[in-house]
A protein has these predicted regions:
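Conserved active-site tyrosine of GNAT-family acetyltransferases
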Residues: 23-27, 92, 121
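Residue-level detection of beta-strand scaffold positions
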Residues: 27-30, 45-47, 76, 89, ...
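A short, structured beta-strand/loop element
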Residues: 56-63
């Protein structure tokens, strides 16, 4: 039996970048995991790793175009940086990012969130249980 995402759930996201190699290096440092390069039609992507099987949310970095551009406004994606928010924030800064919202505790059992500016000018959310 193949797992599928629940109906009406988010299944894909794209983070626009102006320099794919630079952004891939940044996100690999932030997450401590490699991104996979793929070419889909005319677009080259750097795909985020997943560990939740077919039902997990998938996404990528893609070169910006006339339709998209890096931005600190608009929809915000939150990436799981478990097990440690503190370690992830340190990696983000070391890789050239900047913290825009420091670590914030959520209600008991929900972990922590923070927000960063990536190396491309996007504001990205981070979430971790620790």
């Amino acid at each position: 039996m193949q797992a599928t995402a629940p109906q009406h759930s988010i299944t894909w996201f794209e983070i626009p970048v102006t320099d794919l190699a630079r952004a891939q290096t940044f996100y690999e440092a932030l997450l401590g995991a490699p991104l996979r390069r793929e070419i889909l039609g005319p677009e080259e992507l750097a795909v985020f790793p997943t560990s939740g099987g077919e039902a997990s949310i998938k996404g990528c970095l893609h070169l910006s175009s006339e339709r998209t551009a890096p931005s600190s406004q608009g929809t915000r994606v939150y990436l799981d940086v478990s097990p440690s928010m503190d370690a992830a924030l340190s990696r983000a800064v070391a890789a050239g990012g900047r913290i825009t919202t420091p670590k914030v505790a959520l209600p008991p059992g929900m972990g922590f969130f923070a927000r960063i500016h990536d190396c491309e000018g996007n504001v990205v959310g981070l979430h971790a249980m620790g």
